UniProtKB/Swiss-Prot annotation:
Recorded name of the encoding gene: mraY
Pathway annotation from the record: Cell wall biogenesis; peptidoglycan biosynthesis
Ranges that cross the membrane: 3-23, 54-74, 80-100, 120-140, 161-181, 197-217, 238-258, 262-282, 288-308, 341-361
Protein name: Phospho-N-acetylmuramoyl-pentapeptide-transferase
GO cellular component: plasma membrane
Leader sequence segment: none
Highest taxon listed in the record's lineage: Bacteria
UniProt subcellular location: Cell membrane
InterPro entries: Glycosyl_transferase_4 (IPR000715), PNAcMuramoyl-5peptid_Trfase (IPR003524), PNAcMuramoyl-5peptid_Trfase_CS (IPR018480)
Enzyme nomenclature, EC number: 2.7.8.13
Organism phylogeny: Bacteria, Bacillati, Actinomycetota, Actinomycetes, Mycobacteriales
Length: 366
């Protein structure tokens, strides 16, 4: 419990104190966000706001997790688990991809960045490496960081993604991992369009996963082989990472809340999407994450619906996509949209945890 708290506290402090340093530096260098001409008119005043604040978020996550690991080594002698390293590596890899995208935007002075092909290749390579590694490193109980089964609250034993011959099964599994990583990283990226929206929603999701992973740690099959135990590798490390993500997002939100002094950029949004994806896979809650992170799902779905509708019928379903811009164009104030989306995110997160806990109660009663 101490390590989980320390991870969040350190991440918050690093993020909240590093972010203003970045604001001053980027402002002095004239490195500010460009705003799309086709975007909401109210956003034009944000032109020039420093971006790449995701650097502070990433720094918070890294230092928060590493300090918590160090505390564990000193107090209990327990070293870090491989699951934590793999999810952290995924987060940093996507953060690096986002950094490259942000850097190109700032150098060119246009709201463009890496082309779609470059992003696709970057996410694909990252997903393949992550997918291959999570099936390695079995612990003393034979548990690996990931499995080839689709999961809801835990693995669904009857739904193995890697069906067929070994090579075919592995290809299917890697495609699935790519879709999970690409979907969540792009969904968080699309949500990052209003002051405090993505950082606030991600904080809510991370807070929920602190509870989920802590409960998995307390009821791990490695500790007590009870009926409802969780066959998750390194749940304490995953809880520390979720806590670090929560703390880093809250520290950044202090400066990113309306009116935002800095944006996280793709550096932050792609990294946080990677953290969400990594936690969903390693905690065996891939389908549950859809409920917990429903705001991200709605934001991404609104873009897909808009594009498909326009190409098929020539008509738009929404005034503008992602959907948060639709409500802005209907006359909602930006802060109203953000707060209402936070409320919906909190309700979804509570519902998700309720489903998770109810499943445990049902299993523990037998």
């Amino acid at each position: 419990m101490l390590q989980i708290f320390i991870a969040g506290a350190v991440a918050f402090l690093v993020s909240v104190f590093l972010t203003p340093v970045l604001i001053r530096w980027f402002s002095a260098e004239g490195l500010g966000q460009e705003i799309r001409e086709e975007g909401p008119k109210s956003h034009f005043k944000k032109r020039g706001t420093p971006t790449m604040g995701g650097i502070a978020v990433l720094a918070g996550i890294v230092f928060g997790y590493l300090i918590a690991v160090l505390v564990g080594l000193v107090t209990t002698g327990a070293g870090p688990g491989v699951s934590g390293w793999l999810v952290l590596g995924l987060t940093l890899a996507l953060g690096g991809l986002g950094f490259a995208d942000d850097y190109i935007k700032l150098v060119k002075g246009r709201n463009l960045g890496l082309n779609a092909k470059a992003k696709l290749v970057g996410q694909l390579v990252t997903a393949i490496v992550f997918g291959l590694l999570i099936l390695q490193f079995p612990n003393a109980h034979g548990l690996t960081p990931g499995s080839t089964h689709l999961s809801f609250v835990r693995d669904i034993a009857t739904f193995d993604i890697a069906i067929g011959p070994a090579i075919v099964g592995m290809i299917l599994f890697l495609i699935f991992i790519y879709l999970v990583i690409s979907a969540w990283s792009n969904a968080v990226n699309l949500t990052d369009g209003l002051d405090g929206l993505a950082s606030g929603v991600t904080a809510i999701v991370m807070g929920t996963y602190v509870l989920i992973t802590f409960w998995q740690f307390r009821n791990s099959c490695a500790v007590s082989a009870q009926a409802a135990c969780y066959a998750v590798r390194d749940p304490l490390d995953l809880s520390m990472l979720a806590s670090a993500g929560l703390g880093a997002c809250l520290g950044f939100l202090w400066w990113n809340a309306a009116p935002a002094k800095i944006f996280m950029g793709d550096t932050g949004s792609l990294a946080l999407g990677g953290l969400v994806a990594g936690l969903s896979v390693t905690t065996q809650t891939e389908l549950l994450m859809i409920l917990v992170g429903i705001i991200f799902v709605i934001e991404a779905a609104s873009v897909v619906i808009q594009v498909v509708s326009f190409k098929a019928t020539g008509k738009r379903v929404f005034r503008m996509a992602p959907i948060h811009h639709h409500f802005e164009n209907k006359g909602w104030a930006e802060t109203t949209v953000v707060i209402r989306f936070w409320l919906l995110a909190a309700l979804a997160a509570m519902s998700g945890f309720a489903v998770f806990y109810a499943e445990w109660l049902n299993g523990a009663s037998f």
